[in-house]
Amino acid sequence: KYPLQFNVVETLLRTVRQQLPIAVEEPENYSARATMLWAASWALNSFCTSGYKTQAQLHALEQFSSTYDMTHGLALAIITPKWMTYLLNKDETVAGDFARFGLNVMGIQDQGNDMANAKAGIEALQNFIKDELHLPTTLSEMNITDEKFDELNKFVNAVDIYDIRQQYG
């Protein structure tokens, strides 16, 4: 692991977790919006991921949003928790990182083991998106119906994931 980068990313995520609901509920709140812009600038800085492999598949998969007139952030809000669940089911070695995310960013109660903490963290993220940000959490809520999933699979196949119907519908 790369503790400096990991800690910086965790702090950025925690800051976004704290400030984004304020920026959404109070769009005129300069401090919250400025903090979000500053956090976004840091998140895009390669310093945060220097030295370790990132999960760029999520951003590659998200490119479908331009086809369906969704913002980048909305598409990521919909697919990120499902993508995390997919990764956790595919590769249990991510459980520790996802558990840390749940505990330190989402503020979950310790469930006693990494796998349970990872699942609780993903659930907390999903609830945050739905309940605090008031965003849709499925593609079907965005009127992306089953007949469009074959087209969406081209994005999935480009990043070596499986049938999108199973994950996001």
Task: Identify the function of each model-found stretch.
Residues 2-124:
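Active-site segments that bind and position negatively charged phosphate/pyrophosphate groups
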Residues 100-169:
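C-terminal charged capping/lid subdomain of soluble metabolic enzymes
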